[in-house]
Amino acid sequence: MRLPIERNQECPFDPPARLRGLPPMARLEMADGHLGWLATTMAAARTVLGDPRFSARQELKHTAVHVVRPGGPARPAPPGFFAATDPPEHTRYRRLLTGQFTVRRMRLLEPRIEQIAADHLDAMAKAGPPVDLVTAYALPIPSLVICELLGVPYTDHDFFQDRSAALVTPGRDGAQATADLTAYLGELVRRKRVEPGDDLISGLTGELTDEELTYVALILLVAGHETTANMLALGVFALLKEGLPFEEGAVEELLRWLSILHQGAPSRAALEDVEVAGELVRKGETVALSLPVINRDSAVFEDPDALRPDRPDARRHLAFGHGVHQCLGQQLARNELRIGYRALFERFPGLRLAVPATEVPLKHDASVYGVRCLPVTWPTAD
C-alpha cells in the first residue's frame, strides 16, 4: 500500500475506506520505495511516539509522501530545526521554547485573538454574503497571531502564506519556498539582534545562533498558522454539514474527528529492532502514523465515527502528538480555535454553506488536510 489516498467527497471527514480495517501495524511502501510500516491504533502510535528507540531525525526516516525537508533528503536537519532532532539536542531547544509558550502567556493573548476575530467578522458583515471563510477569516486569524507572537511583520503575510502552502502542497516548489522563507527569516533575525522587540524571536537572540533561530522561526511560523487555519475552516465545514451547533467542548472532538495531519505524519525511524503490536520493526525501518484512523480507534472511543461535541474523553486524541515532540503551541491552537468558532457562530447564528457540500474543494493531496475555500452565507436584514 502507498499514500496518498483520497478521501470520499461524499464523506469528506472520514478516513479513506482503504485505511479502515487494517492491522495495528500494516506494511507501507514509502515515497522512495522503502518498505516501512503504518501504525493504525492508539496503542501502537503511543509506543512509536513515546519509545526512545524510535527517532525523529530526518536523515534516518523515509517519508510516506514526497515532502521537502530542510537540508535535503537523507541529511541531518540544520541547526534549530528541532522537530527533526532527538534528545539531548531536542531537549535543549524544547526547554528554551517551553519558556516562551507558557500558559500565562497564552492566556494573555486571548483578548488579542478575540479582537482579531471581531475585526474580521466586522469586515465580513460589511462585505455581506457570500464570502470565502478561508480567506476572510480562517487564514488571517492564526496568521496575525503568530506574526505578533514571533515579531514577523504581517504586511508580509502574502509572501509567507504562499511559501508555507508550497511546503505542504505536492506540485509546488517546496525547495524554493524553503529557501525564500529561510532568507526572509534570517534577515529578520539579524534585525532583531540590533533592534529587539517584545516578541519571541527577540527573546531568544541571546540563546541561539542566527541559523538556529532562523529554523526555529521557520517551524513556528509555518506550523503556527497552516495547521490552525485549516482546522478552523474544516471544523466550520464539519459543523455546518452535520447540522451541529458549536459548544465549548467541541474543539477537542473536532480535533479528534477531523485529524488534519492525514498523509502518514508524524513518523519515526527504528534505532534498533523493536516489537510493536506483535510485529517486529527492524532497525532502520520507518513507521508512519495514520492519525485519521488512530483518532477513531474503537478500543479507545465509543462510537468513534460519530461527531459528538460533548464527548467526555475526546482529549485522548493524538492531534498534537505524544511524547517529547508533543506540539509546543497546542494551547495557543486550542485558544484560537475556541475563540474563532465561538465568535463566528455568535455573530452569524444563521451561518450556512453557500454551495452544496459536495462542491467544497478539498485538499486531498496536501500533507495538511482542509478545504481550499469555504463559501458561506447568512441571513441579512434586507
Where are the regions that the model predicts?
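Cytochrome P450
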Residues: 1-382
